[in-house]
Amino acid sequence: MGTGDFICISMTGGAPWGFRLQGGKEEQQPLQVAKIRSQSKASGSGLREGDEVVSINGNPCADLTYPEVIKLMEGITDSLHLLVKRPSSGTSETLDSESETTNHQHLTHEGPMESTTLQIQQATETQSEDFFLAPVQTKVPLTEDQSNAWGYAECPKEEQAPPMLGSQEGHLVEEVILRQKAEAGQPGHVVELQLSLSKERHQCTSGPIVTLQGNDKSTSPDPDWSSQLERTVHINSIPAPEKADTSLTSSTSSGRELRVIQGRDPGGAGLPQVEVILDCSDRLKAEECRLQTGRGCVASPVEGGRSEAPPSLVSFAVSSEGTEHGEDQRSGKDQSRPHKHRARHARLRRSESLSEKQVKEAKSKCKSIALLLTDAPNPNSKGVLMFKKRRRRARKYTLVSYGTGELEREEEEEEDQEAGDKDEISEVAFLGTSESEVDEELLSDVDDNTQVVNFDWDSGLVDIEKRLNRGDKMEMLPDTTGKGALMFAKRRERMEQFTAQNEEEKTGGMAGGGPDALQTDGLRTMTSYQRKEESVRMQSSVSESSFQMGRSLASVPQQNGFSGVSETAGAQRMFPMNRTAKPFLGSMNQPAAPFSPTRSVTSPISDFPAPPPYSAVSPPPEAFSRGVSSPVAGPAQPPPWPQPAPWSQPAFYDSSEQIASRDERIAVPAKRTGILQEAKRRGTTKPMFTFKETKVSPNPELLSLLQNAEGKRGTGGDSGPEEDYLSLGAEACNFMQSSAKQKTPPPVAPKPAVKSPSSSQPVAPVSPVWSPGVAPAQRPAFSTSNPPNPPQVTAVSSIKIAQPAAPPARPASALNLAGPFKGPQAVVVSHNYTPKPSAPTPLVNAAPAGAGGPSNELPGMSGKGAQLFAKRQSRMEKYVVDSDTVQAHTVRAQSPTPSLPASWKYSSNVRAPPPVAYNPIHSPSYPLAAIKSQPPGAQASKTSKKKGKKPLNTLDVMKHQPYQLNASLFTFQPPDSKDGLPQKSTVKVSSAPAMKQALPPRQANVGSPTNAQASSVYSVPAYTSQPNFFAAEATSPVSASPVPVSVPTSPKQESTSTSYFVAPRPKFSAKKSGVTVQVWKPSVVEE
C-alpha cells in the first residue's frame, strides 16, 4: 500500500448512507468511494470521494468483489464503520484540530483525578510495520451534545484491536489525539494528547514526543484551565526487554501530569504507555453531583469495531499529517442521534437530517430558557413574573369543563393540562423545565410504570402529587375533575338508554316520560329538536328561547299534557307557521333576547292557539310590545323558566327525549339547525348599517309590523316571526321570512313596487320624487294626530318620507297607483311595503314620526344605526334619516343624495336629471314651494308641469334657498298634496293654475282633499288651496320628522315659495325638514 492516512468513519441511523463505491476484486482495483451525496450521512461524517475502503464493520474488503460488498452493505442496518485510506497527498480531514478545540466544552470529572491511559501496541517482527492502538483503561465523563444526559462510563480493558496496515515507506507518524469534553453548564476546554512515534521506535533510536495541549481560548471561570500552556515532552522510548517499567513523568503548569510508561504486554513486546493525569478544580468537583451514570460504546478507530468504552470522549486516528481525528461515538442510549466530537458545529452532523438538527437546537434553546425561568437570577424580573402570570392564567382556563365534551376528550385535556402545568419533572431531581429531555422521555414512555414526582414551582410543594401511568389518570383525577367525569358518565348512560327512543322519535314517535330525568338534569337549555326534520326546522321556539327548569313539577305536568298525540299534531300544525327561522320561539311573545323568559307568550293560556298568532308575521300590538314586558306571560307562572316549559318542546316531546337530544347535540353538532350560528356569523360581518336587527327587512309583513299596531294586526296575528326578525337582524330576518309562511310573499327585489301610504295617491306615478327628508316636528305632531290613519303611520315609519298617508278609503287605489311610483320610492325606503295599505313603510325613523306604538316597540330601529345607514347610502334600500341627520346634510348642500337611492344622482345645479320632456330651468321655482309645503307640492307638481316654467327668476332662489335656507328632502308627494298647499294669496294665485293642471292627473285623488283635511296628514286637497297652515299640516305628516316646527312658520315659507312653487312642476315636493337635500323627481306623467 502506498503512503496514506487511515481514518475510521462511523455512520449510524441505517441506510441510505449517501455514498457510492466502485472497484472490487473482480476489477483488480481497490474499493473506492466513487461519489458522495451532499447533505448525506457520508458527507457529514467526513467521507470523501477517492477514499479507499479498507474494511467495512471489521470485514476486510481487499478480497471482496463488488457484489459481495453491496451485499455486505445491505446487511448493515444500524451503524456502519468504515476504515478508509486517504492518500497522504490529499487534504487533511474535514475537521481541523483548532476548530474542534474551540467548539468543545469544558471537561468535567467524576473525581478530583482522572486517569486516561493509552496503550500503543507493537506488532510482531513479521508485522513490524503495523501498529496496534487500543485504549487500556479510561475513566472519563460521558458527554454528548447539550441535549443529552450527563454521565460517566467506566469500561473494562479493551481487547487487542486487529492489526492496522501501516506504510512501509518513510516514517509513519502516529498521532493519538485524546479529546475529552463534558458539559458542565459553561464553555469548557479540549485536552489534546498528541503522541508522535517514529516508525523505528522499537529500535530505540528515538523516543516518543508527547504534546499536551490546553485550550487557551476557553472561557471557563477556572483560571487554571484558561492559563494552560502547551508543553511538549520528549521521551526516550526504551524497548521492553531493557526497561520494562521505565517511566517518565512530566507535569504541566496546570497541574496535569503526563507520564509515559514503557511496559510489557502479555505477549512480551514492549508497550509504551502514555498516562495523563488531570487535576480538576474545586469548581469542577462540586459539579460532579449533577452527573448521572451511564454506559456507552466506542468504536475502535483502527478497525471500526465496537467495544465498551465512553462514547464521544476519545477519538483515535493515525495520520502522517498529525491532523486526523477519530470519530465520536454515540451513546448506546441515544441510538437515534449521531454525534461527532465537534459538539455544536453549524455543519450537519453525521447521519443527522436538517430537521433533526433544528429540533435539537430548539430543544436546547427551550431548555436554556426554562432554566433561566426556573432559576432566574432575579426572580422579580418582569419576564419571569410575566411568564408565571401567563402560565397561571393558562392553567386557569384549561381546567376540565363540566357538562361539555366527551369522556375521552376530557381525559386528553386533563393529561395535556397536567403535562403542561408541571414544569419540573424528573425521576430523581427536580429539573427546571418541562421541556427537559427527562420530562420528554417520561411523558412519552407510555409503558413506564415508574412513579414520577411532579413539582409545580408556582404553587409549591402543595401541588406535588404522584401519578401512575396514563391509564390510571381518570381514577386519580382530583375531586373537581371527578365531578365532571361523573356528569359525562351519566350523560353517556342516558344516551345509551334513549338510543332506541331517539330512533322512534326520528320516525315521528313521541316518547313520553323521563320527567324525573329532566328534573335531575336541572338547569338545561331546551335546545333539543325533534329528530324529524320538521321538528328541527320547527321553531326551537320553546326550547331555545329560555333555559327550561325541568325541576318545577308544575312544568312537568304541562309537558305531559302536551305530550298527548293530539297536541303533537297541533304542534306539527304549528310548525309550518313557526317555520320562520326564529332563534327562540319558546314563548309566543318572547323578545329577541334568547333568554328573556318574562314574556312567555302573549298568553300561555291556549298553548296551541298562541302559536298561530306567533307564526303570523305581524304580531298584535301587544305581542309587539312583548319586548318591553311579558304582558300575557305575566299570568303564566312567575318564574320565567316554567312558562317557557309549556311551550318548550316538552309540550311536544318527552323530557327524556329532550335530555337525549341535548346529549346528542353535544356529541353530534350536525343535528343543530344552525340558525343561531348563522345569525351570529352574519352579525360578525357588520353590515354597513348597525340597526339592532330588523331595521331592513323586505318582508311586507315585517313592514306592517313596524308601522303600527294596527298594521301589525292587519298583517296577521303572529308576532313571533317579527320578533325573531328583530332579534336576528336584517339578513337573518330575510332568511327567516322566506322560510316562514307569510300571507303575502315578500317581494324579492329591494325595489319592488309595494303598496305604501304614499301610493294611496294615484298621481304618485306622475311624480316619483324621492324625499328622504325629515320633516320638522310640526309634521310629526300632525302625524301623531293622524296615527288613526294607518297609512299616515306608515308614511312616518318609512324613511320619514314626506309621503302623505292616503286616507283609509284610498289606500287600495293609492297603493296600486303608487306601485309604479313606489318602485323607486321603495328603493328609498328600502323596505318592501306590504301590499296592505295599512303599514306600507316600516322605517326605523317612522316610529318617531308619530307611530308611537312602533317606535316604542322597535326602539332599536331609530338612532345612530339609522343615521349611519343613511350616511353610508346603503345599497339596500332601507335607510332612516333623522331630523338631526337632515340638519347635518344642510351644511353640505352639494350631496343630499346620501339619503336617496344610489340610482338618483343629485346635482347642486340641477336637482335631478330632467325627466322626459322636462325642463329643469322651469322647475327650479317649484322646488322652493315644494320645500315649504309638501302636500301642496303634489298639486304644484302637476301645475308646475305647465306653470312651473313661468317663474324663471325663481331659479336662483331655488338654488340657494333649498339648500341653505331650508333644509329639505324631497319626498314623493302625489300632485294631490300640492292642491292642499295654497297658503296665501300669492300662493293661491300660483296654486290655482297648479290645481288646474294637477287635477286631471289627480282625479283619482279627488276624494283625497277631504281626507287630507280630515287627516291633516299629507292629504291632498286637489281642488282648492287650503290654508297655509293646513297645507303645512299636510306636509308635516309626510315628513314625519321628529323635530316639531311651528305650523305658521311653514305656511309663511310655503307662501313665499308657493308663488314660484305653484309654477314649477309639482314633481318636486320639498319638506321643511330643514334639510338642504332636495331631489328633483321626474314626473312620470307630463302634460
Swiss-Prot record:
CDD domains, alphabetically? PDZ_SYNPO2-like (cd10820)
Residues annotated as carrying Phosphoserine in the record are 300, 319-320, 540-541, 543, 546, 555, 596, 603, 618, 697, 719, 767, 771, 895, 899, 903, 1008, 1050
Q: Where is the composition biased (Basic residues)?
A: 338-348
Q: Where is this region: Interaction with ZYX?
A: 993-1012
Enumerate the spans annotated as PDZ domain. Answer: 6-88
Where are the stretches annotated F-actin binding?
656-796
The compartments listed are: Nucleus; Cytoplasm; Cytoplasm, Myofibril, Sarcomere, Z line; Cell junction, Focal adhesion
Which one of the record's GO molecular function terms can you name? muscle alpha-actinin binding
Phosphotyrosine found at: 614
Q: Which stretches does the entry tag as region Interaction with YWHAB?
A: 551-557, 599-804
Cellular component annotations (GO), alphabetically ordered: focal adhesion; nucleus; Z disc
UniProt KW Phosphoprotein keyword: yes
**Where is the motif (PPPY motif)?**
611-614
Tissue specificity is: Expressed in skeletal muscle, heart, colon, stomach, uterus and lung. Expression is restricted to muscle cell layers in colon, uterus and stomach.
**Sorted alphabetically, which keywords does the UniProt record give?**
Actin-binding, Cell junction, Cytoplasm, Muscle protein, Nucleus, Phosphoprotein, Tumor suppressor
Polar residues compositional bias, start-end: 207-230, 246-255, 781-797
Phosphothreonine (modified residue): where? 323, 602, 744
Region entry F-actin bundling activity, spans: 656-909
Claim: Nucleus is one of the keywords in the record: yes
Mark out the compositionally biased spans (Low complexity).
Answer: 751-777, 1037-1051
Write out the ranges of the annotated region (Actin binding): 740-893
Q: Where is this motif: Nuclear localization signal?
A: 388-396
- Which protein family is it in? Belongs to the synaptopodin family.
- What is the annotated quaternary arrangement, including any partners? May self-associate in muscle cells under oxidative stress. Binds F-actin. Interacts with ACTN2; ACTN2 is proposed to anchor SYOP2 at Z lines in mature myocytes. Interacts with AKAP6, PPP3CA and CAMK2A. Interacts (phosphorylated form) with YWHAB; YWHAB competes with ACTN2 for interaction with SYNPO2. Interacts with KPNA2; mediating nuclear import of SYNOP2; dependent on interaction with YWHAB. Interacts with IPO13; may be implicated in SYNOP2 nuclear import. Interacts with ZYX, FLNC, ILK. Interacts with BAG3 (via WW 1 domain).
Q: What function does this protein fulfil?
A: Has an actin-binding and actin-bundling activity. Can induce the formation of F-actin networks. At the sarcomeric Z lines is proposed to act as adapter protein that links nascent myofibers to the sarcolemma via ZYX and may play a role in early assembly and stabilization of the Z lines. Involved in autophagosome formation. May play a role in chaperone-assisted selective autophagy (CASA) involved in Z lines maintenance in striated muscle under mechanical tension; may link the client-processing CASA chaperone machinery to a membrane-tethering and fusion complex providing autophagosome membranes.
Protein name per UniProt: Synaptopodin-2
Which gene produces this protein? Synpo2
